[in-house]
Amino acid sequence: MRVVTQNAVTCFQNGGNGTFSNTRVVTENGISKMYLFGNLIATLEHKVGGVMKITNAGWESNTTRERLNGLPNVHIRQVRGEWFLNGQKWNGQLTEV
């Protein structure tokens, strides 16, 4: 895992705010949001038992996949151009994990 991903994920999980290269974490009202190049890719509702949702925001890039894979309970891989989330084909739409 890249250092920028590790730092962003730690901030995201701890409910912090920060910018890490092309990744920004903003926390307001108990909800952390992770942005990559200005696109929302993950949310974490700290007050609701840690409900986390992810999306690729329409970008099937290596960087998007790498940032999302840094999150707990997220394993994304690409096979023949198709993305799989935790072993299931995934279209990149907002999904609770």
Place the predicted regions along the sequence by residue:
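Terminal leader/tail segments of proteins
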Residues: 1-97
